[in-house]
Regions:
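Conserved Class I S-adenosyl-L-methionine
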Residues: 183-245
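A short acidic, Gly/Pro-enriched loop at the edge of an enzyme's catalytic core
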Residues: 97-107
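Class I SAM-dependent methyltransferase SAM/SAH-binding core
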Residues: 44-48, 52-97
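Short, glycine-/aromatic-enriched active-site segment of Class I SAM-dependent methyltransferases
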Residues: 138-159
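Conserved class I S-adenosyl-L-methionine
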Residues: 1-37, 54-55
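A short SAM/SAH-binding and catalytic strip from SAM-dependent methyltransferases
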Residues: 106-118
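Short alpha-helix
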Residues: 161-176
Length: 245
């Protein structure tokens, strides 16, 4: 059953750009990142913090890769399994890090690096599970740490940890990962944050009927802040690929 929240989210995206993602990425950006990471037939892909795996399911269907999605939320994984149908997707529940055992040619982390305060530990785990020559494909919110005032305004601020681009590149390099591609998405993600904010406000009464008034208010507040920060340059968004030496 499609919820009011999902309908509002889908309405915010340009035609053909919504594939079930819970983020500011458009489908075209997800495809471009997967291509840069050389995701293809038979490639073993680990998708961290996959949620309901909208991007992962699309990538699997279009590329023929072997896909493993990992998330901590059992209900999201149940939805992902149901929607995956006959696709060759597997899903595991885990709190990250550590990462699951095994070796992978590509590790994906879409729109959730922000939630990890210890980027060094995360990058080290990614390096551990990558095959030599493997690729880490991710998006990152680039900027200074939040001030106390910003943390007070942002809902769930304990999951909001921007990082400087130079600092992140250094952490990757120290772990044996070399950045091979980078593209800025600040403008398009500002547009998406603003469009989502507009749709959530328009349907706020119906959304509140499903998730509650407080959760709806926090959803709108968070998107207002992201729209402001991306629009002002307080935070910038990048898609990147780093390869294991």
């Amino acid at each position: 059953m499609v919820t009011t929240l999902e309908r509002a989210r889908a309405a915010a995206y340009p035609a053909g750009e919504y594939v079930g993602q819970e983020s500011f990425m458009r489908a075209a950006e997800i495809r471009a990142l997967a291509r840069r990471a050389r995701v293809g037939p038979g490639v073993f892909v680990l998708d961290l913090c996959c949620g309901v795996a909208g991007p992962g399911r699309m990538i699997t269907a279009e590329s023929g890769c072997h896909y493993l999605g990992v998330d901590y939320c059992a209900s999201s994984l149940a939805t992902a399994r149901e929607l995956a149908g006959s696709l060759p997707c597997r899903f595991e529940q885990a709190h990250l890090p550590p990462l699951p055992g095994g070796r992978f040619e590509v590790v994906l982390l879409l729109e959730t690096m922000l939630a990890f305060p210890d980027k060094e530990a995360l990058v080290g785990e990614v390096e551990r599970v990558l095959e030599p020559g493997g690729r880490f494909a991710f998006t990152v919110e680039e900027g200074r740490p939040l001030t106390q005032q910003e943390r007070a305004r942002m809902p769930a601020a304990d999951t909001v940890w921007p990082v400087g681009l130079a600092e992140l590149t250094g952490l990757l390099r120290e772990a044996g990962l070399t950045v091979t591609w980078r593209q800025e998405h600040s403008s398009s993600h500002h547009a998406m944050a603003t469009a989502l904010l507009r749709c959530y406000r328009a349907d706020s009464a119906q959304i509140a009927g499903q998730i509650g008034k407080q959760a709806t208010a926090e959803l709108i507040t968070a998107h207002q802040l992201w729209s402001d920060w991306l629009g002002s340059g307080r935070v910038r968004k990048f898609a990147m690929v780093a390869e294991k030496r």
